[in-house]
Amino acid sequence: MIDTIQYLLGPIERLCCLSKRQVLPVEIDDTTSALFELQSGITGTIGTLFATPSNSLLRIYGTGGLIEAKNEFSEVSFQGDGELYENILIQPSNTLTAEFSGFCDACEGHEAYPVSADEAIRNVAIIEAMSSSSKQMGEWMNISGLLKKGAV
């Protein structure tokens, strides 16, 4: 979801996060909540729950309406100010298979991988910042600062 948010709205600049194990019997965090601010000043939240059935939901609110993508992004809805939802159905695809196929194509020199090295590094920096923030009781983390320090 981090890469999708940045692709659509721009780079995440800073974030704070709480993450902990609440339900699962294995020693991994199963509940995570993060508040973030993009370089543009837009704010948002990311939440993950590994102890629930798999589900992906992206909802973007704006002054002129909202857009929502759900059911593994195969269903997109838009609602303008005071309007009914407009639903768009997209043919579902296995995104993991597509990702591996794209990686193989890039390795074989057929096509460039759709995610640049800089984008991948920034995505990892954000995940690392979420982990660090949670370990420091939700302290705000500056992503550009982490990248400049080479912390990732």
Regions found by a protein language model. Name each.
Residues 1-43, 49-53, 118:
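Rossmann-like dinucleotide-binding domain that binds NAD(P)(H)
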Residues 12, 42-43, 64-66, 73:
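Structural motif
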Residues 58, 74-82:
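Short polybasic amphipathic segments
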Residues 89-101:
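Active-site loop of classical SDR/Rossmann-like NAD(P)-dependent oxidoreductases
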